[in-house]
Amino acid sequence: MKPTTIASLQKCKQDKKRFATITAYDYSFAKLFADEGLNVMLVGDSLGMTVQGHDSTLPVTVADIAYHTASVRRGAPNCLLLADLPFMAYATPEQAFENAATVMRAGANMVKIEGGEWLVETVKMLTERAVPVCGHLGLTPQSVNIFGGYKVQGRGDEAGDQLLSDALALEAAGAQLLVLECVPIELAKRITEALAIPVIGIGAGNVTDGQILVMHDAFGITGGHIPKFAKNFLAETGDIRAAVRQYMAEVESGVYPGEEHSFH
């Protein structure tokens, strides 16, 4: 199978073809996703909650991310694999580069970091040294204590303009992908249209170039609070492989996420 690359996603944006992505944490699920043609995966620091049982992503370490990245890579050798740099792993550009090298050696193709314009020098540091970067704006879970909980971001003109400014700054610094989480659909549309790079949404409506879901949300095995943007595809299909195919089909057609999964 031909490897999926950032160029593959760039072509999807150019062709206005929506694409699905998903989190993965181990060999078995990564292989299953790849076998069904879902070839863009993220080893997210969400593993702190879904795999380790913490109440936030903050306890996750670079070693944790590297371990799970290596497992996923073995299951999906040709996927485009993103890996989060976890909380306090990129406080300085130099620290970011050192930790990015660790997860890249484990098998990642790209690192994802949360934050806006303050990350410009870090993004430049990484991309100039051959480390591809995916930005992450909106509800950035590592900032949960600043936000006072998991809340929609970017509502109102000032907040929306700031997120757009952040997105443009990250792109100008060299970021090649952007994740937008829990923002109003109208703002997601503005940002997606303003950027040349692909934008992946989660809780950002069906107007972004791609979608991502935490796999546990997609299969209805999340404990506790279920996010508004989540959909249990396993409940509809009764089979994990069929659920993966249904998720991909609904993303590609624009059926998911629907109005009931979106914010304004």
Curated annotation (Swiss-Prot):
Gene3D superfamilies, A to Z: Phosphoenolpyruvate-binding domains
GO-annotated biological processes: pantothenate biosynthetic process
Cofactor(s) for this UniProt protein: Mg(2+)
Keywords: Cytoplasm, Magnesium, Metal-binding, Pantothenate biosynthesis, Transferase
InterPro entries xref list: Pantoate_hydroxy_MeTrfase, Pyrv/PenolPyrv_kinase-like_dom, Pyrv_kinase-like_dom_sf
Organism superkingdom: Bacteria
Location(s), subcellular: Cytoplasm
Record: active site: 181 (proton acceptor)
GO cellular component, as recorded: cytoplasm
UniProt GO MF annotations: 3-methyl-2-oxobutanoate hydroxymethyltransferase activity; magnesium ion binding
Binding site for Mg(2+): 45, 84, 114
Cofactor note: Binds 1 Mg(2+) ion per subunit.
Subunit structure: Homodecamer; pentamer of dimers.
Family: Belongs to the PanB family.
Role this protein plays: Catalyzes the reversible reaction in which hydroxymethyl group from 5,10-methylenetetrahydrofolate is transferred onto alpha-ketoisovalerate to form ketopantoate.
Name this protein carries in UniProt: 3-methyl-2-oxobutanoate hydroxymethyltransferase
Gene that this sequence comes from: panB
